[in-house]
Structure formats: C-alpha cells, structure tokens
Amino acid sequence: MTQRSLAEWLAYLERLHPSAIDMGLERSREVAVRLGLGRPAPRVITVTGTNGKGSTCAFIASLLRAQGLKVGVYSSPHLLRYNERVQIDGEQASDAGLCEAFTAVEAARGDTSLTYFEMGTLAAFWLFERARLDVAVLEVGLGGRLDAVNLIDADLALITSIGVDHADWLGDTRESVAFEKAGIMRPGKPALCGDFDPPLPLLERVAELDSPLFLRCRDFDLSVNESGWSWYGLTAVGEVLRLDDLPLLDLPMENAALALQAYALLDLPRDAEKIADALQATRVTGRLDRRHLNWRGKSLTLLLDVGHNPHAAQFLAGRLQARACAGRRLAVFGLLADKELPGVVTPLLADIAHWAVTTLPSERSRPAAELQAHLVSRGAHVEAHGDVASALEAQCERAAAGDEILLFGSFFCVAEALMWLERYAQEDVQDGNAG
C-alpha cells in the first residue's frame, strides 16, 4: 500500500468513525492492548479542567525541562498544524513520526472503530513510549472519566477549574462536570485542584480513592502585587514551601501556581531562579497571545485568545482591565452554537468600543447575524462579517495608532487569525512595504 502523507492520514481519521465524539474507553483499551502499549513515561501527569488546561501543561513542561528532564506533552486541539498536539522535549512531532505512529495504530485496530481523537491519543502514546521520556504530561480532551487520555493511570491528577461547558456531554451543573473530571484520579495518588470550592462529587471521589488532595487556598495559593507574585505550597511529606518575587506573567498565574504545586510533589531541585525563568519563558499560542502589526503605517496590537466560555471571558476582562491601553479596544468575535453567548460577551462589553462579529468556518458556528443582533440589543457598536479575515481587516482599517484589537471566542477564530497573519506577513515581504 502506498504510504499516506500526514494530510492524507488526517483526512482518513476524520471519516473513520461515524461520530466525532463517542465517549468510552473500551475501544481504545482494546486497541492499546493489541498495540502492546505500556506507560508513555515512568511518571505521568494528567490535566483536566474547564479552563486553563493548556497553560497548566505548558508551565509544568517548562518547569520539568528546566531541570533537564525529557518531557512529552499531549494536548488538543491544534490551531494550525496537527503536529502541535504531540511535543517531545519541546519540539513538535514530525510528519514522518506521526505517520509511522498512525500506521502502527491502524495495523492494531483491526475492525475496531476509533474516533479521530482516540486514534491521535494512541499514536501519541506510541511515540512517547519510543522517545524514552522522563515525564509525560497529558491534557484531557473532554471531561476526563471517559476520555481516551484516561487509559493511562496518572501519578498526579490535576483539575484546573470546574465550570459548565460541553453540557451535552458533561451535564449542565458543576456537580456533573466535577464527577466526570474526578474520573482521572487514581487510588492513593495525589490529586490537585485549582478550584478552591470543588463540588461534592469531587470530594466524594477523593475520599473513595483515599487520594491526598491538594486544594487551592488551603494547601497552596498565590498572592500578587504590582511588581511580582509569591507562591506557597506543600511537598508530598507536608513540608511548607514558599517562593517570593516571581515575575508577573501574561498567562494565568493561578495556573502557574497549580503547576508549581505539581512540581513540589515530584521531589525535584528547587532552584528559585530556574523556576522563575521557566515560568517567565512559558508561551502558549492563542492564550493571551500578543502580536504586533504594522497595518498601512499604523502600529497596532492584536491580542488573540481562545477563551469561549463565561469563566474564560471573565478572566480575559480582568486582564484587560489590569493592563492599560493607549487607545481604544476593538473586538473580532466568533462563537460556536453550543456556547453561552450572553455569559461570554457580558464581562467584555464595557471594554470594547466596537465589535466585528463573524461566522466561523464550522457547521457548529453561530451565524454572525445572531451575534450582531444580540450585541446590538446590549447597546454595542457592531458590524457583521462573513469570515474572520474580513472582520480582522475591517478592524485594522478602523483602528488608530495605539488601538488594540482583541480576537476571541473560539479556537476556530484564533486559527483563522493566525493563518491571516501568516499570509499578511508573506504579502508584506513580497510587496516590500510595511503593510
């Protein structure tokens, strides 16, 4: 059989299973056994949560790599290239490596139908096992209990936050969401929770498993001032640790605090300077992602954020209010139909001078006209566009020097913006001008 390219593999995976999401571990476990998969690394950290999974995984990986450990990170979704999902020692997996992994999983699959995510998860585990990692950091795709990542018994289980999202799959209460996310815990293994008021099902699961629980505001926390922040936490034997004068971060420092608590439980060197440098160097594309653009002689700032639920919008609004803007703030906004529109836009209404709303390149997108009607009813200045690129270009034209353009609401929205920025940069070079 002719070898498939990565693009051909991904197209194949998209049509392999009748539904994009099919919760359950039975199919994946069956194929993993046939594939002969063991543990992806001697130590495994699994991360779930309504918000903050990606940045928490990135902080943990940075902290571990600063100590010379070889770390694999599995995350989703990707923004531009599938390779983003599988990182080994700070580098994205190669096309050739992913194709080899998909070939191995396909050979083991037989007649067992797997979803796109399940195939990708098993392929990542296959690559990690061969990379001889020290630590694997695994980000749950959806929920936790029935997510393919949960095939692996985690040494540390992290729950970043608990809010209502993906209600069709996880339920429409914090209690139902907590039950699903608590499914990543294992008997006697430490569990960490960044939500300082976890719902009862999570606490019941902790008691049932006799797992040590490290809870924010009780066992670890942070305090922030104008020049930096401090953290305290506990070691596995209950020793109190403290770090002061940590640098302020663009990414959520609450997630850095959770990552530090995970690090404290691994009994690794505690060089304060290395820790501070690792945190400050952490970047996550599409999360409070600041880009500078010269548009027709105007110096503009773009802020890209994949936040798409009320909790994420509240955090984003807080960060905008804490950081002064020389001019106005304009928005480019798109949202999927299963997301809570009023809850996402309300925290940001006071900060946005003008909205450009757009339909996203997904069958699940809310139409731009629906977004426009809602925002108009809330007294906002808004215009509708058919795609992200035209909305972004319209806001670039509207903006004056010193203005900031916030683009948020969906991974689809940020991915389209990143592709537009790539095209714009290429055209800029070809034209020999500054935009």
Regions found by a protein language model. Name each.
Residues 1-19:
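Charged, amphipathic alpha-helical linker segments immediately N-terminal to NTP-binding catalytic cores
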Residues 41, 135-138, 147-158, 162-164, ...:
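Nucleotide phosphate-binding/pyrophosphate-handling subdomain across enzymes
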Residues 196-201, 208, 213-214, 225-227, ...:
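C-terminal helical cap/extension that packs against the catalytic core
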